[in-house]
Amino acid sequence: MRISLNWLRELVEIKLSPEELAHILTMAGFEVEDIEDRRTWANGVVVGRVLERQPHPNADKLSVCQVDVGATETLNIVCGAPNVRADIYVPVATVGAYLPNIDLKIKPAKLRGVPSQGMICSLKELGLPSEVDGIYIFPQENLPLGSDVRPLLGLDDVILDVTATANRADALSMVGIAREVAALTDAKLSIPKPGEAFVSESVGKLGLKIADTQACPAYIGTVIEQVKIASSPEWLQQRLRSAGVRPISNVVDITNYVLLEWGQPLHAFDQERLKSVANADNLTIGVRCANQGETLKTLDGQTRNLTTQNLLITANDQPVALAGVMGGEETEVHEGTQSLILEAALFDSVAIRRSSRSVGLRSEASGRYERGVNRAELEIANRRALSLISELADGVIVHQEIADTRPDPTTWSRSIFLRLDRVNEVLGPINVGETGELEAKDVERTLTALGCELTPAGEGTWNVSVPPYRYRDLEREIDLIEEVARLYGYDNFCDTLPDKAEAGYLPVDQELVRKLRAALRAEGLTELIHYSLVKPGEDRQIVLSNPLFVEYSALRTDLLAGLIDAFQYNLEQGNGSLNGFEIGRIFWQEEDGLQEKDAIAGIIGGDTSLGKWSKGSKDQPLTWFEAKGILESVFQQLGILVEYQPDCRDERLHPGRTASLWIGGNRLGIFGQLHPQLRRDKDLPESVYVFQLDLDVLLDALDKDEILVPAFKPYSTYPASDRDIAFFAPVKISVSEIEKAINKAGKGLLESVELFDEYRGENVPQGQRSLAFRLVYRASDRTLTDTEVEPVHNKVREALVEKFGVNLRS
């Protein structure tokens, strides 16, 4: 937004230079992108009066003028403008003047043989826009000759190009910037009074019909008659030009002026043209969404094809304007306008943004509506415009209609609880006082300057009432703290070193998962990642209601299916057996609702050894025990003891070669060989083994002090005493159960138990097998004697006979 310092000085007392003011605004978050110092544009240009004009003797298009600039002698100036004539007041660039906009230094010269002692200037030569070819002629009479033209042309001004952040819609107006400058510099604020607009008594002049009160919560329509359309006074035109707005006519310029001053968009309709569009004398102004297929020719001359996303202003249901964006060409104010309807309205920011984007049209009005217009200043801006129209266009206000569904004005402000301790905690040390902390009076002074009202709520606490024009961006305590920091100045904060940082660390679960991944990779397994979405078809699957693809429309219930398919695909591609694992989430549904948990699964198969020369170039598939050994090695690296029990619940696994895994009495998962039928269906080798574990159960088992922080246990320096024990045991009794019983019976001296032989066949009773274990006894403080070992070993033998009914062979 372009800010005129001359205009700003009327609203707030400014004693700073333009550069100092620009620095303060930039430090407060309003970046000043450019400082346009117009005072240099017409330095040395004075008011002159053309006394006489004669044609140039040697050129048809040139004139020789005698110009009085208040000096002792008149100047002889050659001019090529077609509109130069005698007895007019003009800007004259005297000898020595420099015009930076055309890069010209005025020197005495001869033009076609006639001496010229200056130049009569046009507005373009002075850097100002102009729609008239030729020199500029002052409309005023009896101007002091030789006086500086800059105050007359608005060239005694400095323009700041200020960018407001997206959350500061209130700063898109001169009043908003004035409030900000007053708060930053502790200067006196002089907000312009809107004036009183007298509405004469009349009935039936205008009706309102708001179809969507959410999109248009407030609408004021005012009928004004006896309007005289003319050019705006010079002061108004100068202010519009300084803001980059082209003056058009007094009424249109007033609506643009109020937009710049208060940030409230307004629009003026020609009343007679509205009646023509509506084809009726009684008008009803409406606000509704467009119907598909409707069109509207806007003020830029473009015909817009409308959709239901566009919000319209209508006259008796006929489109006349894009609400909050741009008016229609059919109803614009023109030179012959004598009566008009002034629109002042509040439109929803989302509705305007959607409407603006759908037609690819942005305007000053839509930009402000999209950011949010202050609902408390609608009437002020409307009265200001009506007062100026009455003053500058002789308009008579004959009727006014208001449709207002805004909430009660008491809700236009909010109260926020603010704590002084929290302010200093967030901001840290500041260059203020001896303590380096803000005091209560500092906070009160800063927020009061912003227009907030503070009510003490205790020692160092306040209830802060936010003004309506800051309602949209001051919502929480942290917003108020930011305002305190911004107004106090970010450059006033102390330079402090950050506190000593602690070394970063991962949560225990993540550390354990990383340790688990490392253990699996150490065993030669590759980590795989599959989609969580799979084909539907299982009973317990959770199916998506709106999938992108039918093939990926259900959540996976386990990880094994994806691993088996990946193993098959790699074989088909000639890549050999894929030994891998995956950590991921699985999902299923039960009667009590949807369930999910993390799991880890793996697949092992084929010949894992390198080189076949020692095996006669033949594959040597993994046995069940070798595959189990890989998993056991992982558990050993993790420092946990897992028990195996026979299991045959999973139909995809071999019923006689499947075990469930248990840890601490909790089911950990399953391990087994693929079922022969599944192996044949997928054309897989015979020795393919899979496992799937409950990751939560595994992490709970690992999350123990003795595992997370291993304790040193000294090795015994004394020799061990070995004992072997062999017996016939029922096949239904697992080795793990037997080992558990042996460890319990030999507790104290027993160091380890190892199965070293299993035999089934001749000389073994039906339904039994021969098992042989090696038991190692050792003490940490002495060499064990036979008299110490034998009682313990006999206790083990007795426990096996008593618990399992084994037939001892040794």
Swiss-Prot record:
PROSITE patterns: B5 (PS51483), FDX_ACB (PS51447), TRBD (PS50886). It catalyses: tRNA(Phe) + L-phenylalanine + ATP = L-phenylalanyl-tRNA(Phe) + AMP + diphosphate + H(+). It is found in: Cytoplasm. Mg(2+) binds at D473, D479, E482, E483. Its EC number is 6.1.1.20. GO terms for molecular function: ATP binding; magnesium ion binding; phenylalanine-tRNA ligase activity; tRNA binding. Residues 411-495 form the B5 domain. Its main location: cytoplasm. CDD domains: PheRS_beta_core, tRNA_bind_bactPheRS. Pfam families: B3_4, B5, FDX-ACB, tRNA_bind, tRNA_synthFbeta. GO terms for cellular component: phenylalanine-tRNA ligase complex. Residues 716-809 form the FDX-ACB domain. InterPro entries: aa-tRNA-synth_II/BPL/LPL, B3/B4_tRNA-bd, DNA-bd_dom_put_sf, Fdx_antiC-bd, Fdx_antiC-bd_sf, NA-bd_OB-fold, Phe-tRNA-ligase_IIc_bsu, Phe-tRNA-ligase_IIc_bsu_bact. Residues 39-150 form the tRNA-binding domain. Gene3D superfamilies: 3.30.56.10, Bira Bifunctional Protein, Domain 2, Ferrodoxin-fold anticodon-binding domain, Nucleic acid-binding proteins, Phenylalanyl-trna Synthetase, Chain B, domain 3. GO terms for biological process: phenylalanyl-tRNA aminoacylation. Keywords: Aminoacyl-tRNA synthetase, ATP-binding, Cytoplasm, Ligase, Magnesium, Metal-binding, Nucleotide-binding, Protein biosynthesis, RNA-binding, tRNA-binding. Binds 2 magnesium ions per tetramer. The keyword tRNA-binding applies. Its cofactor is Mg(2+). The keyword Transferase does not apply. Tetramer of two alpha and two beta subunits. Belongs to the phenylalanyl-tRNA synthetase beta subunit family. Type 1 subfamily. This is Phenylalanine--tRNA ligase beta subunit. It comes from Trichormus variabilis (strain ATCC 29413 / PCC 7937). The lineage of its organism: Bacteria, Bacillati, Cyanobacteriota, Cyanophyceae, Nostocales.
